[in-house]
Amino acid sequence: MKGSHGPCSDLTVTMLENVPLAPLTTLKIGGNARWLVRPSGVKGLSRYCRTCPGDLPRFILGGGSNLLVDDNGFHGVVVDLTHTLNAIVVEHQDAHGGILRVEAGAATRKTAHVARQNGLAGLAFMAGIPGTIGGALRMNAGAYGCDVKGVLLDAQLMDATGNLHTRNAQELGLAYRHCDLPKGWIFVSARFHLARGESEAIKSQMRDYNHKRTQAQPLRYPSAGSVFRNPAGAAAWQLIDAAGLRGHRIGDAQISEKHSNFFVNLGAASSLHMEELIELARNRVAQHSGVQLTLEIGILTPQGLRTEPGR
Ligand SMILES: Cc1cc2nc3c(=O)[nH]c(=O)nc-3n(C[C@H](O)[C@H](O)[C@H](O)COP(=O)(O)OP(=O)(O)OC[C@H]3O[C@@H](n4cnc5c(N)ncnc54)[C@H](O)[C@@H]3O)c2cc1C
């Protein structure tokens, strides 16, 4: 119900109660959010940060493509920027290139296509990465030797009290699937510094990347992408494979036959089964190769987001 009740009554946010989270994630697993807010814009987000009770846990949701939600849902406030903070604008361009300004709730794939349409190169790697620019910043998303760090000019962030700050890639400490985001801060937008490119050439590069993806990844099934981080000098999928777990299944949660670091939902997987599968893979890999795998994905529990070192 809009702005009329809940922990943060305000006309600048839409506030919904008991919202199913599974449809808002790519894995399609999990229970309800106690509250879900959609701020009307940057001002609405700032007002929400200033007025919402600090004792309620808060989670910023992007495209939910790096996330496993607990079957019992989340007993706090999910902030969703995808409906209102999703503009993609060419801020400047000349013969050498340009600057693309993108709000955090914009889809990563759409961002890549807008850059291409404007003859701006450097975001082709994003064409097959699901989710939003906010999530891509938080995860320093990357593929095919490129990542957000390599193209980010700067990002605008909001702190827990609703004030705006600007940070560049170095200040954000972007590294492999990592960002030094201060606790409670939210990405609002990003500016990407892109070189001039030829739209058809960028399109063909995207096609090539997406073809490789289709060959290697189980895109027909719901998943959250790579479950584990690649340990130094190794690929998590090879370690899981070597431990004999390719295709292993608990209920409807399965280690993909196609890519052993993608765990797929065959239809009605529960978070319980997915977590059992994760722990099985972790233990078997430790026994088989002596490597301790850590999660790339986050697990949203009723109390908040659970992550592992490095993320
Ligand atoms: C089929 C498939 C393929 C994938 N391929 C790749 C790949 O090639 N490379 C890669 O890097 N990843 C890949 N991923 C993983 C995932 O798509 C990326 O990590 C993506 O960038 C996550 O974005 P999201 O918006 O979905 O984030 P979410 O899953 O919604 O959130 C991820 C984290 O970001 C935080 N977050 C989201 N928005 C904000 C914000 N505005 N401010 C602050 N924090 C925020 C969340 O709180 C959470 O901690 C893949 C996933 C799938 C399902």
Curated annotation (Swiss-Prot):
| Enzyme class at the top of the EC tree | oxidoreductase
Q: Which reaction does it catalyse?
A: UDP-N-acetyl-alpha-D-muramate + NADP(+) = UDP-N-acetyl-3-O-(1-carboxyvinyl)-alpha-D-glucosamine + NADPH + H(+)
Identify the EC number(s): 1.3.1.98
Any one Gene Ontology molecular-function term assigned to this protein's record: FAD binding
Quote the pathway field: Cell wall biogenesis; peptidoglycan biosynthesis
Catalytic residues (UniProt): 177, 226, 296
SUPFAM superfamilies associated with the record? FAD-binding/transporter-associated domain-like (SSF56176), Uridine diphospho-N-Acetylenolpyruvylglucosamine reductase, MurB, C-terminal domain (SSF56194)
**Pfam families in the record:** FAD_binding_4, MurB_C
Q: What region holds the FAD-binding PCMH-type domain? A: 28-197
Q: Which cofactor does it need?
A: FAD
Which GO cellular component terms are attached?
Answer: cytosol
Gene Ontology terms: biological process: cell division; cell wall organization; peptidoglycan biosynthetic process; regulation of cell shape
Q: Which UniProt keywords apply?
A: Cell cycle, Cell division, Cell shape, Cell wall biogenesis/degradation, Cytoplasm, FAD, Flavoprotein, NADP, Oxidoreductase, Peptidoglycan synthesis
**Family matches, as Gene3D superfamilies:** 3.30.465.10, UDP-N-acetylenolpyruvoylglucosamine reductase, C-terminal domain, Uridine Diphospho-n-acetylenolpyruvylglucosamine Reductase, domain 2
Q: Give the subcellular location.
A: Cytoplasm
**Main localization, broad class:** cytoplasm
Which InterPro entries does this UniProt record tie to the protein? FAD-bd_PCMH, FAD-bd_PCMH-like_sf, FAD-bd_PCMH_sub1, FAD-bd_PCMH_sub2, MurB, MurB_C, MurB_C_sf, Oxid_FAD_bind_N
Superkingdom: Bacteria
- Family assignment? Belongs to the MurB family.
HAMAP family this protein is in?
Answer: MurB
Function, as annotated, reads: Cell wall formation.
Q: What is this protein called?
A: UDP-N-acetylenolpyruvoylglucosamine reductase
Gene label: murB
